Amino acid sequence: MASKKGVRLIITVECTECRSNPDKRTPGVSRYTTSKNRRNTTGRLEIKKYCPHCNKHTVHKEIK
């Protein structure tokens, strides 16, 4: 039998400045994986994390 889906989801967050900023230290897009609680956080997640391509802390938004 298949098990029931849990409440926690594994999601990917991506740097918002890497896509639009050509003045980066290195080419590429910063992505992190994290988990979120489906019941408590129903909307898209936004966190400030370090981006090695921009060389600073930036807002990372959830992508599908």
Swiss-Prot record:
Q: Which Pfam families match?
A: Ribosomal_L33
Q: Which family does it belong to?
A: Belongs to the bacterial ribosomal protein bL33 family.
One function term, GO molecular function aspect: structural constituent of ribosome
Which regions span the lipid bilayer? none
Protein's recorded name: Large ribosomal subunit protein bL33
Q: Which UniProt keywords apply?
A: Ribonucleoprotein, Ribosomal protein
Q: Name one GO biological process term.
A: translation
Has UniProt tagged this entry with the keyword NAD? no
Q: Which PROSITE patterns match?
A: RIBOSOMAL_L33
A GO cellular component annotation here is: ribosome
Q: Which domain of life is it from?
A: Bacteria
